[in-house]
A protein has these predicted regions:
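AMP-forming adenylation/ATP pyrophosphatase catalytic core
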Residues: 1-50, 68-70, 76, 105-110, ...
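Core alpha/beta nucleotide-donor-binding catalytic domains of modification enzymes
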Residues: 2-220
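Non-catalytic alpha-helical coupling and interface elements of nucleotide-dependent molecular machines
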Residues: 131, 195, 199, 222-229, ...
């Protein structure tokens, strides 16, 4: 949309004043092409440059398209500054006619796997708010650098094809659409938006703490770039892997459709013997999806645990076991997965 067309839309003056910059207009237009959405949505804010840029872009989008959007930030209370930071972000966004609500993670905090557990808790709070407000779309600020970091982390952990391309632009979880419209944006462009529009963003000290795997990977990527590593080449590889993943996913979906039955009344999934007679990767993914479905998990169970239980199911001695919030039982020629309460 041109600057002239944007000026014709009813936009608060404090936001409209930021639309005189041609780079901002170019980034808004790029965002509009990437953000294909019709219904209302919730935006997850952290206070970092990525999420503040997302706050601005989604606000302009919602005004142009007359769509309702709501903004939430999670105060994890992992640092003593976090509550004041959340309140400061709320105050700054409020001055731009962006209403932000703070969600608080109360209770005991972990001493290990802090980032992973905090991420899960953040999504739990946000998904809960989506269900409460009957909004099906949750927008998050992952960008191209996150895509690269995720690829390297998964590769080091020995992930398969699906894991290597797991940061998808859109993912459905418990009927909530998790959407990442910034996945093709460079971090430097998001920092530009945040600085130009808000003249502010939070610098999280944990982003420099090398005790976290993601931070070590980030520094490794920076060093590789100094040695001539090109992001575009890796994005090409990722794109090819995604095509292969889609082909495998087709057969996974066929296996689930033809060889499993969902008993909604009893909240259980019945897997026919043919379910386990497919190529191993198809069985592995189909079974992993089944555990996620019945266990109502956001993240899949670790691959090694899936391997172990599939090995047991293949033996005549298998009776029952628990995994991922599910009870798995063998009954004659079928396997039944039910929710563990």
């Amino acid at each position: 949309m041109s600057l002239k067309n944007l000026n014709a839309i009813k936009i608060p003056k404090i936001l409209k004043d930021k639309l005189s910059n041609r780079k901002i207009i170019k980034l808004i237009n790029f965002f509009d092409k990437e953000f294909d959405i019709k219904g209302n949505f919730i935006v997850a804010i952290s206070g970092g440059p990525d999420s503040l840029a997302l706050a601005f872009l989604t606000k302009i989008f919602s005004l142009k398209n007359k769509i309702s959007c709501k903004y939430f930030i999670v105060d994890h209370k992992l640092r003593k500054e976090s509550t004041n930071e959340a309140k400061n972000v709320k105050r700054i966004l409020s001055s731009f006619n962006i209403k932000l609500e703070i969600l608080t993670w109360n209770g005991k905090k972990p001493s290990k796997n802090i980032q992973s557990i905090a991420r899960k808790k953040r999504y739990d709070l946000l998904f809960s708010k989506c269900r409460q407000l009957k909004i099906e779309n949750l927008i998050v600020g992952h960008h191209s650098d996150d895509l690269l970091e995720n690829f390297f982390i998964r590769m080091i952990r020995g992930s398969g094809l699906k894991g290597l391309v797991s940061l998808e632009k859109k993912k459905v979880f418990n009927q909530i659409n998790l959407i990442r419209p910034l996945i093709k944006f460079d971090k430097k462009d998001l920092e530009f938006i945040s600085n130009y529009v808000f003249n502010f963003f939070i610098k999280d000290p944990s982003n420099e703490d090398t005790k976290y795997t993601r931070i070590r990977i980030r520094k490794l990527i920076n060093e590789l770039q100094k040695e001539g590593f090109e992001k575009d080449k890796l994005f090409l590889t990722l794109n090819n892997l995604k095509k292969s993943n889609l082909a495998v996913s087709f057969y996974v979906n066929e296996n689930k459709r033809l060889n499993s039955f969902l008993d909604r009344d009893k909240n259980r999934l019945i897997l026919d013997k043919s379910f386990f007679r497919q190529p191993y990767e198809i069985v592995f993914r189909s079974f992993s999806d089944s555990i996620k479905l019945i266990g109502q998990r956001y993240n899949a169970v670790r691959g090694k645990k899936i391997d172990n239980i599939l090995d047991k199911i293949g033996k005549n001695s298998f009776n029952s076991e628990t995994l991922g919030g599910c009870i798995i039982k063998k009954a004659h020629q079928t396997v039944i997965i039910s929710k563990e309460y």
